[in-house]
Amino acid sequence: MTNKEFYNKALSESSPIKQVGWENEVKAIKRYKQIAKLVPPKTHTIVDYGCGIGNFAKYVSHSAKYIGMDTHTEFVEFANEINPELQIIPTDGKGNVPECDCLVSIGVWTLRGELDDLQYWNNIVIQVNNMVKHVTGSIIINGFHNQADYKDPKLYYHDISKWIKLANLLGLKMKVLVFEKFEFVIVLKK
């Protein structure tokens, strides 16, 4: 099943959390709340890169201008139908984002599809390199780390040491937090 097929199938689900492929609604809400706490208090504009249908917006849009972005056009169209007050726009998936104070990428780099780990990581590096040019504050990234007990072959498991090298290469400060048993959150700052 391709990524597009996976997300088209997910969109037909009844729960907003399951519509973007998250299996556990309680964990997803907990994830959103914890990541929202990491958004710096004086953030004026936040980009939600890979926003799905904009579920994260309700945790941050009261305190900052929210811009959701997704490569999946069906998500963007549906999100704009159900959240007309939000700005949700398509992205080319190359990390080209509008100017912002903070960018969040929640679970975006998890479903690797047909790419091998090296190809997938190189794609992430290109995206983050482009993002850094447009983000004045924090970049907050959530995903699965490679120390997980069980690994689904369809998913990508991040090697935190690669993130450390990338942060150093880009001149960024980095903080790593463990979320749940096999998830991490990385906060990158200039």
Name what the model sees in each region:
Residues 1-38, 43-52:
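Conserved class I S-adenosyl-L-methionine
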Residues 53-87:
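Class I SAM-dependent methyltransferase SAM/SAH-binding core
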Residues 135-144:
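Conserved beta-strand signature within the Rossmann-like core of class I S-adenosyl-L-methionine
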Residues 154-170:
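Short alpha-helix
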Residues 178-190:
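Core SAM-dependent methyltransferase catalytic element
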